Curated annotation (Swiss-Prot):
Organism from which the protein derives: Caenorhabditis elegans
Misc. remarks from the entry: In eukaryotes there are five DNA polymerases: alpha, beta, gamma, delta, and epsilon which are responsible for different reactions of DNA synthesis.
Keywords: DNA replication, DNA-binding, Nucleus
Chief localization: nucleus
UniProt subunit comment: Consists of four subunits.
Family: Belongs to the DNA polymerase epsilon subunit B family.
UniProt feature coiled coil, ranges: none
Name assigned to this protein: Probable DNA polymerase epsilon subunit 2
UniProt GO cellular component terms: epsilon DNA polymerase complex
GO molecular function: DNA binding
GO biological process: DNA-templated DNA replication; error-prone translesion synthesis
InterPro entries hit by this protein: DNA_pol_a/d/e_bsu (IPR007185), DNA_pol_e_bsu_N (IPR024639), POLE2 (IPR016266)
Function of the molecule: Accessory component of the DNA polymerase epsilon complex. Participates in DNA repair and in chromosomal DNA replication.
Length: 534
């Protein structure tokens, strides 16, 4: 058989095989398949074709028409096999580079948004972002086993009712249209609510724009609330099972979710002692802080982590005329500390996440990376990434979200329920995971770019959520989720606390460098004074 005849036969075979599985290949996609398979025998062609089809079936596709680009990406993923070293398993995703996936209520699946994202959003973008938040929480509530016996009522039905109704249950977003007058809103309308002194608030933080379940009595167009509860938290495994999808919504070019990749899960199992270190509020202009950082770097040089994540603020004098000069000097100082250790940390990725008061960083979320002029001191010495805030980190099959913002006290300050200081960590962790969003506060309290609200979404939930906050250090795990919520605290303000995460073991170790040890050159492992295991 001549080459042309063989190509034609292969072309017909490929088209027929994909058609059997309800896929239609574009002309360019067929040409690429022929090019990829022409030099292989029949059995190899069959094996690779079946692998690609299985991979395509696991993805949420907009159409059954398959493009050349999709074939290339699918073949690349099928061909990827074996293990990689720890450094190549790590990826950092900028908030502004993430694909905007939305939940389609009609299709009941996540779909890629067709409209381009813009920094200059209009009013429709704000309403779209709010609807998406509501859709995600609502679809979790509708499939939650513990809520199956509840009959939910919409605001529209209540608004048109003139009857006295007992035990009304509404899923809605809490809003305040005027002082001391609260409403709950859903996609159909809004209804006024009234809280009593004995209204029972379940274990969470309830504030404006919280999406929650309200139960009470409806009379005279007002819902008098008896109980308020968050929607139960749903693990990533359950989310993907319910949506029947292994598609990657986290970040990067891979089509298959990292946690669903057998190759990455196998690679993670071989990284038993690999760790990631997280520090927040690292004042590079403070000599004592830099001594503590040097102590940490020296302590880990014999067994360096795969990544060290430094979160801002990076200057003790924010928003001053000399702030940028202090920062420039601080990064130069850090570079000098790293120079003699560069061989020890040649496989470690240093990640810098800006804080709320760092220069050139807008107050609107998400925030871009630090000024590029600071890169010049660090980049020639170590492998580093200047990330956005928030940012997403993938290590093997693990998904990690890092968010630097002092929102815990702000959230507590705007909460309508009374809380104790001791309960704040668990309440906050439950609230942020139930809302499936890093910043569920209203725009006038903490503004968010509506077209990039998806970058703050926690759907499905990650393996680890780092909420780098000035609040006291804590590590929490919420019932129903596999996610660890970890706050390393303020490194500079809280006597040099930091957190260490072991992804293979799914364990967080909360550590601290005692002030008395800063003049001692012993290994950092001897100065860890406490830890929590999960």
């Amino acid at each position: 058989m001549d080459t042309t005849a063989e190509e034609n036969a292969l072309r017909r075979e490929i088209v027929k095989t994909f058609q059997i599985h309800a896929f239609e290949l574009k002309k360019e996609a067929v040409k690429l398949c022929v090019k990829l398979f022409l030099d292989h025998d029949k059995e190899t062609r069959k094996k690779w074709t079946n692998k690609m089809i299985e991979l395509l079936k696991k993805q949420t596709l907009q159409s059954s028409l398959i493009s050349e680009e999709l074939i290339r990406d699918t073949f690349r993923q099928c061909k990827s096999k074996g293990t990689q070293d720890a450094g190549k398993l790590l990826n950092v995703f900028d908030a502004f580079s993430l694909q905007p996936y939305d939940f389609d209520a009609d299709l009941r699946k996540m779909v890629l948004r067709k409209e381009k994202t813009s920094l200059a959003a209009d009013s429709s973008s704000f309403s779209h972002a709010a609807r998406q938040r509501f859709f995600i929480v609502k679809q979790r509530a509708m499939r939650c086993a513990s809520l199956k016996n509840f009959k939910f009522t919409t605001c529209e039905i209540l608004g048109s009712s003139t009857k006295h109704l007992q035990s009304v249950v509404v899923l809605g977003m809490l809003t305040q249209q005027k002082a001391d007058c609260y409403h709950i809103e859903d996609l159909s309308g809004s209804v006024e609510v009234e809280f009593k002194e004995d209204t029972k608030f379940h274990h969470a933080l309830f504030h404006e724009h919280s999406i929650a379940i309200f139960e009470g009595t409806f009379e005279n167009s007002v819902l008098t609330v008896n109980e308020v509860a968050m929607v139960p938290v749903e693990s990533a495994e359950v989310t993907r099972k319910e949506l029947s999808s292994n598609e990657n919504w986290f970040g990067g070019d891979d089509k298959i979710a990292f946690r669903c990749s057998d190759r990455l899960r196998s690679a993670l199992a071989k990284q038993e002692d690999t760790s990631l270190v997280f520090l927040s509020d690292v004042f590079l202009d403070d000599k004592k802080v830099m001594k503590a950082v040097f102590k940490l770097l020296q302590g880990y040089k014999d067994q360096p982590p795969v990544a060290i994540v430094f979160c801002g603020n990076f200057c003790s004098r924010p928003r001053q005329t000399d702030t940028i000069d202090l920062l420039d000097r601080g990064f130069r100082w850090l570079a000098n500390q790293l120079t003699p250790l560069r061989k020890d940390y040649e496989k470690t990725q240093f990640i810098f996440v800006p804080g709320p008061d760092d220069p050139f960083v807008d107050t609107v979320l998400p925030r871009p990376h630090l000024p590029s002029l600071l890169f010049k001191h660090i980049s020639p010495i170590i492998s580093c990434t200047f990330a956005s805030n928030p940012c997403r980190i993938q290590f093997a099959s693990q998904e990690i979200v890092v968010f630097r913002s002092d929102l815990i006290k702000k959230t507590c300050r705007h909460s309508i329920n009374s809380i104790t200081v001791e309960s704040i960590p668990s309440r906050y962790a439950r609230s942020v995971l139930s809302q499936a969003h890093l910043c569920p506060l209203p725009q006038h309290i903490t503004p968010v770019l509506p077209d990039f609200s998806h970058s703050l979404s926690l759907h499905p939930l990650p393996d680890l959520l780092i909420t780098a906050d000035r609040f006291e250090t804590f590590t929490e795990k919420v019932v129903g989720a596999d996610t660890i919520v970890s706050n390393p605290g303020s490194f500079s303000r809280s006597n040099y606390t930091f957190h260490v995460y072991y992804p293979c073991q799914n364990r967080v170790e909360a550590s601290q460098i005692p002030v008395s040890e800063l003049d001692d050159h012993s290994n950092i492992k001897n100065v860890i004074i406490f830890f929590f295991l999960f």
